[in-house]
């Protein structure tokens, strides 16, 4: 009985494959166009390309751990914010960055944060400390994990990279941070932030 079932499956697959190849032979452009349309649709919705000449006009700074020091690098950028800070974070437990965000809120900077849901249960998360400071903090309810590490400052500067906003990222892990000062790029990141916020 098992052999008969296997034989039936093999014949069915061969039959379907034969039909597909026959259709492709008659009209190969249909399949090519279909794939191209799908790819173009994805690009239009999710992908923004930047060429080297565009980014070469931007001011770019980097930081790497080890050695420690990227936390201060990020906090200094937050201290320079004048109008707005939009943040996305997976881990949010660093005291220095939290203090910089609270100070920014206190001096009138608009601070908005999206965190991964794990912060609701993590012992060292600064979620509640940020909320007590009247900062608008929301949970990104993506089905998986909200793994972004992004800070958008004054809609013209983007901080991103592998660096979680935690003490471990600065003192124990091998991480990277990149800061790009480019208004168009910042607007692209901000639009993604707003889309994630709206989806919640």
From Swiss-Prot:
Instruction: Identify the EC number(s).
Output: 3.1.4.4
UniProt keywords (A-Z) are: Hydrolase, Lipid degradation, Lipid metabolism, Secreted, Signal, Virulence
Q: Which CDD domains match?
A: PLDc_Nuc
- Main subcellular location: secreted
- Which GO BP annotation is one of this protein's? phosphorus metabolic process
Q: Which Gene3D superfamilies match?
A: Endonuclease Chain A
Location(s) in or outside the cell: Secreted
Question: What Gene Ontology molecular function terms does this protein carry?
Answer: phospholipase D activity; RNA endonuclease activity, producing 5'-phosphomonoesters
State what this protein does. Answer: Could be a virulence factor.
Name of this chain's protein: Phospholipase D
């Amino acid at each position: 009985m098992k052999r008969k079932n296997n034989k039936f499956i093999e014949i069915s697959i061969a039959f379907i494959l034969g039909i597909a190849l026959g259709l492709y032979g008659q009209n190969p452009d249909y399949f090519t166009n279909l794939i191209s349309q799908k790819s173009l649709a994805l690009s239009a919705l999710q992908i923004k390309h930047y060429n080297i000449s565009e980014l070469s006009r931007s001011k770019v700074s980097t930081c790497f751990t080890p050695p420690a020091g990227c936390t201060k690098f990020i906090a200094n950028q937050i201290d320079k914010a004048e109008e707005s800070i939009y943040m996305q974070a997976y881990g949010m437990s660093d005291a220095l960055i939290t203090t910089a965000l609270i100070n920014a809120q206190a001096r009138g900077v608009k601070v908005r944060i999206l965190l991964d849901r794990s912060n609701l249960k993590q012992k060292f998360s600064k979620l509640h400390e940020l909320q007590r400071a009247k900062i608008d903090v929301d949970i990104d309810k993506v089905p998986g994990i909200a793994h972004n590490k992004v800070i958008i400052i004054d809609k013209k500067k983007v901080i991103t990279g592998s660096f979680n906003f935690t003490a471990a990222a600065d003192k124990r892990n091998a991480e990277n941070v990149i800061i790009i000062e480019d208004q168009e790029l910042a607007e692209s990141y901000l639009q993604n932030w707003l889309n994630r916020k709206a989806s919640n």
